[in-house]
Amino acid sequence: MPAGGRAGSLKDPDVAELFFKDDPEKLFSDLREIGHGSFGAVYFARDVRNSEVVAIKKMSYSGKQSNEKWQDIIKEVRFLQKLRHPNTIQYRGCYLREHTAWLVMEYCLGSASDLLEVHKKPLQEVEIAAVTHGALQGLAYLHSHNMIHRDVKAGNILLSEPGLVKLGDFGSASIMAPANSFVGTPYWMAPEVILAMDEGQYDGKVDVWSLGITCIELAERKPPLFNMNAMSALYHIAQNESPALQSGHWSEYFRNFVDSCLQKIPQDRPTSEVLLKHRFVLRERPPTVIMDLIQRTKDAVRELDNLQYRKMKKILFQEAPNGPGAEAPEEEEEAEPYMHRAGTLTSLESSHSVPSMSISASSQSSSVNSLADASDNEEEEEEEEEEEEEEEEEGPESREMAMMQEGEHTVTSHSSIIHRLPGSDNLYDDPYQPEMTPGPLQPPAAPPTSTSSSSARRRAYCRNRDHFATIRTASLVSRQIQEHEQDSALREQLSGYKRMRRQHQKQLLALESRLRGEREEHSGRLQRELEAQRAGFGTEAEKLARRHQAIGEKEARAAQAEERKFQQHILGQQKKELAALLEAQKRTYKLRKEQLKEELQENPSTPKREKAEWLLRQKEQLQQCQAEEEAGLLRRQRQYFELQCRQYKRKMLLARHSLDQDLLREDLNKKQTQKDLECALLLRQHEATRELELRQLQAVQRTRAELTRLQHQTELGNQLEYNKRREQELRQKHAAQVRQQPKSLKVRAGQLPMGLPATGALGPLSTGTLSEEQPCSSGQEAILGQRMLGEEEEAVPERMILGKEGTTLEPEEQRILGEEMGTFSSSPQKHRSLVNEEDWDISKEMKESRVPSLASQERNIIGQEEAGAWNLWEKEHGNLVDMEFKLGWVQGPVLTPVPEEEEEEEEEGGAPIGTPRDPGDGCPSPDIPPEPPPSHLRQYPASQLPGFLSHGLLTGLSFAVGSSSGLLPLLLLLLLPLLAAQGGGGLQAALLALEVGLVGLGASYLFLCTALHLPPSLFLLLAQGTALGAVLSLSWRRGLMGVPLGLGAAWLLAWPSLALPLAAMAAGGKWVRQQGPQMRRGISRLWLRVLLRLSPMVFRALQGCAAVGDRGLFALYPKTNKNGFRSRLPVPWPRQGNPRTTQHPLALLARVWALCKGWNWRLARASHRLASCLPPWAVHILASWGLLKGERPSRIPRLLPRSQRRLGLSASRQLPPGTVAGRRSQTRRALPPWR
């Protein structure tokens, strides 16, 4: 076919004989799509002439590069026509219909890759040998005719019903060898194909390499380098060594065969004819290997289909539980055709299998030569999008031009553009769907502009007016031309204003897009950091789970060993008891036997036979008694053994349960710590995001203010120019009117009182216009008044448009200003005047020659209604506006966007003003259950007597401490529990204070006296000073003024000279008490901000050292502490497990600390048990005294039940997208389940 021919043309006889003239839709029926690829779709069909099952490959040659597609189709058809071999796919014919080629071929069951997909495991070596042998025979046939397949892989090796192996998919094949084109599938490509563009040609040995890769694919379910990118795989194939089989259980023949196929140098690689003589393919194997493999695959597919059908049937019955049962078989028959999978062997009937596939459409990667269609489609889409964007940009101007045309008619065809998705997949979903022939869309002729048409009409008028008589004067024509030029200037001015606004809007959009990109990058970085932390947490959790599992297995093995030892011990004891019993029975039997013999000897008259019988009966009785005794012993031993085993198992089960509880508690503590660390990270990320958004908001506001300033300056300049021009016109008009007045009227106007100014249509007249005024008569005063009234009536429309400073406008000017500018209206109810007299005083402007401040200028331009909206916006966003004004931002009106871009801004924006706040902003959520009611301990009114007693006791003890310092520890121990409780002392606080005091005293003594060798007297003095400072600080913090007063009174009585220092200390303490909270809050916030800017590792270390308090975090982020939604301080949980045996002093201190913690826990649990056993009246008394305190509910975030979470999710999904909540759900992040 000539290169310049049209695609689908059959004028060439050589091309026409390749295709049949019949209609394929009439020849083939029951078409079902069974595969898809970049080339098109593959269909299962049945020939109506002979009921033969065939495979139809539909390929479209329409669209871009149709000639190249047509040439590929012709090449493939010619290639298939030449094939005559049992191991190649058989060609049935090719038909053309509606720019689609129907390539009809022999139908096969499927490909070798389908076998891997169905069985989910590699093939056996015998099966690989059979498949390879058949493929080699087909390749040998191709190579003997100088043909190259160039796309050999498991997906292109097909299996037929009789068990034959066939080569398929010759779309990449080459009719001539050698070849030099870059064609094939990347992972199966030979090195010489990859390097063909640089190093030259290649021959049929490239198929041998691909066959070796296919063997590895059949043996390992995927080709080498399959987990790598396609381009990287090509580089590795060309540069690295040849791949090999990974597993070691394959035979040496198979390994040698694969190594021979994968020789890197083509000259060392054997041909297909040589490989047919290899021992791997010539070894003895059952002749029904392929048939057995196909049958086994059919059975597996049938089972999968039945399972899928049962699942679908179950789903259908669940959706329609009342459906009739008689329709089940019909539903089964209808559901089975839709359960086929492209690339798998499928069974439609239980007796025999109907194939599902003919051509390889299930390979995991497409060929390289098939990527051109997708790229062409993508380029076509990009070009169409660019054309649409250009049309959208030119749209408003062209519409304006069309509106300005007069006397001319244009016909425009608005044809819709059909978009095609990348690739031609969707073109073949319906075989009966006609396809449209795309043709180049002819753009309509550009309409002539209004300027050219008006200038042409003017030139025609000028040419014709010389040949025709006219009554129009030259001055009238010149004035009309001048007015038209003025209108054109105004129109051009408005066009420039529109272009400026559009440019400003684009600049704002570009800035917002850039800032949005920064936010997305920042969000992605924070998300990666969070995911990395979560991955670390997951690794730690897995390690902990493995350790717990190892501990559990170890304990189970130890328990089993102990149980066996225990059973063996009991069995040994019982065996000894049984042996002793048997020994005793033997002795008793001998003694009894001797006694019986003696008794027989004493009575000699008894016959011998009777003696023997009597002796036998006595022996039997004795043996029976011994047997019963032995059976009773065995029964007792068995009962004892069972009882002991049950008791031991119970004991071991309790121990295992306790171990499981400890492990579970450790796991929960670890998870709580991880959640707290994650919460801290999220808080830090929130702070960083807030700062970024603040900076971006400042940048946007600065840009918006600058653009608004430029816009206002332009508007002001245009308005001043217009006002100057109108003032000049009015002066000329007024001068002409004055010149036309009679002299008597001028004299009358000059005789007016000095205090009464001469008024006109526009208010006070200028002084320069009345230089020639003379008195006028009273009769002409009425005429002047009527003229002035008429001028005022003419000025009314202009006042509604421009204010009181202008005069009347022509109707054409009103139309231009009202329609094109879009900011004025002739209705006084809709808009106020744009320019007011007192704000836009031209004389004052000319005298002062300065521009008013921008804020007042904006408010004057906006008008009263816009100023009211401004005030409303200020009320709604008062805090933000105040902060912006403090930062120096100039607030301006939001630029009116271009009409084409309004919808995009509304979609990109957040929730509108007035949207209700959700739990993510700190508000309570309806999904969270209410807190449990307070316990009965808080319901009793607390008695005031213990409070007075405690304060009096502290005051008296403080007075005593002033005289005797030995009572200072007692005062500190009493003060600590009183400070720990809100309404008085508590038992738990007292125990804690005692423990803290003793441990602190002991640790300080060991450190100072033992390590630093401090003298005991100095240590005692230091301990007293520390205790005194602690007493004063604690009493000052809780407001217990009795303690310092008692100490001061005692010291004054002992040392009167301390009065002045004590007074100074009291004054300083009062000032510190007043200013202390504010200073502490400021220092705390500064400290927290410094910590939040540190790296996560340092921040985590400081958390472990308790350098970050939850009170400070919640003060810095108050939304996280609303309505009880707060988390605990993220401090890492102490490391569990046995401590290392070392003799370091710190290790000894750690052991002592662990021992103290253990005793503290035991003491607290004993106190809790004791309190639970007390009667209610005793609990009430102890609670009123402050010795007991009710347990507070945990403020750790609670996880909602799964049902409530699903209800919340379903409710949020059922909301329509147009509602406020729906819009907010589209823009806001989903709430965590515990919120």
Curated annotation (Swiss-Prot):
Q: How is it modified after translation?
A: Autophosphorylated. Phosphorylated by ATM.
Q: Where are the transmembrane segments?
A: 967-987, 989-1009, 1014-1034, 1040-1060, 1170-1190
The positions flagged as active site in the entry are: D151 (proton acceptor)
The protein's location, in the record's own words, is:
Cytoplasmic vesicle membrane; Cytoplasm, Cytoskeleton
Q: Which GO terms describe its biological process?
A: actin cytoskeleton organization; axonogenesis; basal dendrite arborization; basal dendrite morphogenesis; DNA damage response; focal adhesion assembly; MAPK cascade; mitotic G2 DNA damage checkpoint signaling
Instruction: Kindly list any coiled-coil regions of this protein.
Output: 488-523, 576-603, 683-715
Give a yes or no for keyword Glycoprotein in this entry: no
Q: Which GO terms describe its molecular function?
A: ATP binding; MAP kinase kinase kinase activity; mitogen-activated protein kinase kinase binding; neuropilin binding; protein serine kinase activity; protein serine/threonine kinase activity
Q: How is its activity regulated?
A: Moderately inhibited by staurosporine, a broad-range protein kinase inhibitor.
List modified residues, type Phosphoserine.
S9, S181, S416, S658, S777, S825, S827
* Positions with biased composition (Basic and acidic residues): 396-411
Q: What residues bind ATP, as annotated? A: I34, G35, H36, G37, S38, F39, G40, A41, V42, K57
Region of interest (Disordered), ranges: 318-457, 892-941, 1210-1235
Annotated keywords: ATP-binding, Cell projection, Coiled coil, Cytoplasm, Cytoplasmic vesicle, Cytoskeleton, Kinase, Magnesium, Membrane, Nucleotide-binding, Phosphoprotein, Serine/threonine-protein kinase, Transferase, Transmembrane, Transmembrane helix
Q: Where is the composition biased (Acidic residues)?
A: 375-395, 899-909
GO cellular component, as recorded: actin cytoskeleton; axon; axonal growth cone; cytoplasm; cytoplasmic vesicle; cytoplasmic vesicle membrane; dendritic growth cone; glutamatergic synapse
Membrane topology category? Multi-pass membrane protein
Q: What is its EC number?
A: 2.7.11.1
Q: Tell me, in a sentence or two, what this protein's role is.
A: Serine/threonine-protein kinase involved in different processes such as membrane blebbing and apoptotic bodies formation DNA damage response and MAPK14/p38 MAPK stress-activated MAPK cascade. Phosphorylates itself, MBP, activated MAPK8, MAP2K3, MAP2K6 and tubulins. Activates the MAPK14/p38 MAPK signaling pathway through the specific activation and phosphorylation of the upstream MAP2K3 and MAP2K6 kinases.
Protein name, per record: Serine/threonine-protein kinase TAO2
Q: Which organism is it from?
A: Rattus norvegicus (Rat)
